[in-house]
């Protein structure tokens, strides 16, 4: 099974993330940030990646460090669990509706970290959660998972729906991209024979 656990401790946060890429979408999330927990639960459920996240952060300041550092740790865990990436599908893209909102998420598990994020939120906050932190999380995840990730909201009016369509879109794209391709026969999905660089 493709699993990994990452522990990350700084003066600002103490985080432990465990993933099982071949799971069923079971999640156990506790970051102290209700909306963020909801997004990570959606990510696990719709990617079918088992996900445990335990995070303690400096929430008396704001949600920034906890959100970003969780993205770092989760990205590192996914990268570690993928190992050599032999046999994976590698590429995937989805259009994800959430009521009036439609977002497009496309991923390449390339070993080359890139984020293109074209998402606008009509409000600065979703509850107590700063909407600018959605991009911070995606940036941290993409850089540390070493994936090329394009996220774009084509239209939408509700900030909650926009964020949810982005996380669900990533979930479904990840689900497809990390899947083992039975036609690949364990090969690295690159003409170079390796991924990254």
Curated annotation (Swiss-Prot):
The keyword tRNA processing does not apply. Its main location: cytoplasm. One of its GO terms (biological process) is L-histidine biosynthetic process. GO terms for cellular component: cytoplasm. Its EC number is 4.2.1.19. Keywords: Amino-acid biosynthesis, Cytoplasm, Histidine biosynthesis, Lyase. It holds the Pfam family IGPD. The keyword Amino-acid biosynthesis applies. GO terms for molecular function: imidazoleglycerol-phosphate dehydratase activity. InterPro entries: IGPD_sf, ImidazoleglycerolP_deHydtase, ImidazoleglycerP_deHydtase_CS, Ribosomal_Su5_D2-typ_SF. It is found in: Cytoplasm. Pathway: Amino-acid biosynthesis; L-histidine biosynthesis; L-histidine from 5-phospho-alpha-D-ribose 1-diphosphate: step 6/9. It is an enzyme of class 4 (lyase). Belongs to the imidazoleglycerol-phosphate dehydratase family. This is Imidazoleglycerol-phosphate dehydratase. The gene is hisB.
